[in-house]
Amino acid sequence: MQNKKSYRPNVAAVILSSKYPEKCEFFVAHRTDIRNAWQFPQGGIDEGETPEDALYRELLEEIGCNNVEILGEFPEWITYDFPKTARGKVYPFDGQTQKYFLVRLKEEAQINLQAFEIPEFKEYTFVKYDELFQKVTYFKRKVYRRVIDHFIKEGLI
């Protein structure tokens, strides 16, 4: 008998800099708890919370700023398994099912990774599309490419 896998409902933000559309750069941040892991901000959806509400809350918690404009939403939930090395950190879940949003930082937005007592990220940067997939952690690359390519195809990027 095989156990059914358990996936954590989650939101993720593809963040464009406030310079978009003049300059197309993506926000990525370096996690504090996983060596060399760069990724987009993301986090769980609390019970009774909409994905959009979770997006704003998670941005505030993880980057100290939710002063963004939502440009688009990926039409599907994307499910993936955690790599074996990360599974203990997120017990009892085997992976995540994520709703992705494309957002642009507003001009007056101020990122503050130290806004909360236990920071999720230790540093961040903005990268161009062709640099993005070299920078982010290996197990997120396929999903990120799928999501971003969708937003490009839809004319949102």
UniProtKB/Swiss-Prot annotation:
Main function: Accelerates the degradation of transcripts by removing pyrophosphate from the 5'-end of triphosphorylated RNA, leading to a more labile monophosphorylated state that can stimulate subsequent ribonuclease cleavage.
BP GO annotations: nucleoside phosphate metabolic process; ribose phosphate metabolic process
InterPro entries: Nudix_hydrolase (IPR020476), NUDIX_hydrolase-like_dom_sf (IPR015797), NUDIX_hydrolase_CS (IPR020084), NUDIX_hydrolase_dom (IPR000086), RppH (IPR022927)
Protein name: RNA pyrophosphohydrolase
Family recorded in the similarity comment: Belongs to the Nudix hydrolase family. RppH subfamily.
Keywords: Hydrolase
Enzyme Commission no: 3.6.1.-
UniProt GO molecular function: bis(5'-adenosyl)-pentaphosphatase activity; guanosine-3',5'-bis(diphosphate) 3'-diphosphatase activity
Motif Nudix box: chain residues: 43-64
Gene3D superfamilies: Nucleoside Triphosphate Pyrophosphohydrolase (3.90.79.10)
Record CDD domains: NUDIX_Ap4A_hydrolase_plant_like
Enzyme class: hydrolase
Residue ranges of the TM segments: none
Keyword Transferase appears in the UniProt entry: no
Species of origin: Sulfurovum sp. (strain NBC37-1)
Record lineage: Bacteria, Pseudomonadati, Campylobacterota, Epsilonproteobacteria, Campylobacterales
